[in-house]
């Protein structure tokens, strides 16, 4: 792990050595930051940006906040019926449901510091001989998925649209839908966060996503046919064997 405060030594604008938190120092003629986070780049004083630049920065029409612009069916327009966002349906005074932000989304084309949501792209299998059934994660709270229950009650049925098949009865499973594996809004601090804070963010993402899996297996509001099919999936015994069969790397779609 790079010493992000004092770990970069430069001469004439060039990096000549880097020092890790362990105390080890590495010298070289060229250093390449090929990480998702760009910690070396930042520690070296290279200019960068986090979040969306406003349209006026570079004159790009698709920069900044894009309110009313909907993509990939990851939105509530894909749900057949309207859904109340409030704890007591129809009652704003009851407050919003968990995982819903009451903050203003911003004005179209304005910049902000928010980054695209992260998730763990999962390798799943429906091979009974190689499948580890999903289990209840520590800290599971079904109330965190109240919105998902209402989505199903409103008629949404696209659960398996991103269970993309790969060889050996496995999938590359990614986010799809208005409340899926992306942990929306809980990664905004990640690019600039300390190592400790990043670990906390990763843990929260794991808890959310494993809970999302368990909700599908157990909650009575999940349609019966979807739930029974969900129970045929699980983590492969022969993948990520040194990490409880869970992916090591979160899907950092963007950071610095």
Give, region by region, the residue ranges found by the protein language model.
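Conserved beta-strand-loop-beta-strand element in the redox core of flavoprotein oxidoreductases
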Residues: 7-25
């Amino acid at each position: 792990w790079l010493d992000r405060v004092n770990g970069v030594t430069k001469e004439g604008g060039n990096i000549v050595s880097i020092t890790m938190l362990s105390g080890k120092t590495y010298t070289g003629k060229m250093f390449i930051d090929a990480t998702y986070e760009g910690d070396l780049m930042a520690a070296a004083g290279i200019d960068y940006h986090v979040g969306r630049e406003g349209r006026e920065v570079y004159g790009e029409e698709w920069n900044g906040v894009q309110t009313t612009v909907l993509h990939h069916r990851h939105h509530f327009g894909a749900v057949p019926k309207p859904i109340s966002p409030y704890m007591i349906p129809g009652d704003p005074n009851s407050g919003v449901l968990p995982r819903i932000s009451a903050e203003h989304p911003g004005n179209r084309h304005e910049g902000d510091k928010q980054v695209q949501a992260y998730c763990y792209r999962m390798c799943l299998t429906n091979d009974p001989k190689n499948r580890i059934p999903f289990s209840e994660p520590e800290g599971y709270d079904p109330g965190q998925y109240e919105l998902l229950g209402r989505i199903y009650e409103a008629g949404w049925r696209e659960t398996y649209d991103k269970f993309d098949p790969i060889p050996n009865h496995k999938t590359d499973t990614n986010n799809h839908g208005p409340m899926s594996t992306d942990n929306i809004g809980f990664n905004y601090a990640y690019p600039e966060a300390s190592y400790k804070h990043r670990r906390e963010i990763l843990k929260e993402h794991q808890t959310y996503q494993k809970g999302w899996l368990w909700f599908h297996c157990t909650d009575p509001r999940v349609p019966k046919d979807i739930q029974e099919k969900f129970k045929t999936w699980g983590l492969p015994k022969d993948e990520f064997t040194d990490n409880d069969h869970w992916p090591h790397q979160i899907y950092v779609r963007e950071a610095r």
